[in-house]
């Protein structure tokens, strides 16, 4: 089986990673000359990855969130995101606001590590498509 992921932003890259882990051959297509450009732009203001509050309180921030949103967040809660980042060699910390940040406040090392992992998993990339 082969999957095409359209868009190389965080959602597309995570989709590619999940599919590749499941044994699917993946190609990521993006119209830009490199992946993760908006991710890098978001980091200019100090990228917060998630929030450290407990899951029910976090979900409460979404009001009457659709059941699908609840299932998605429960499947990949904030602690799992922190573990994922740390497995990429990018430790995190909780700021005074409760938000979780990369320890060095930079997105580029996180993105490079993520792209390296995807490459090692066999994910193919087609840019300017």
Language model segments and positions:
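Glycine-rich FAD pyrophosphate-binding loop
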Residues: 4, 20-44
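Glycine-rich NAD(P) Rossmann-fold beta1-alpha1 loop
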Residues: 9
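N-terminal Rossmann-fold NAD(P) dinucleotide-binding loop
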Residues: 12-13
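Short, hinge-like loop/turn segments at secondary-structure boundaries
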Residues: 43-48, 111-112
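Glycine-rich active-site loop/strand segments that organize a redox cofactor
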Residues: 46-94
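Feature captures the FAD/FMN-dependent oxidoreductase FAD-binding
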Residues: 74-129
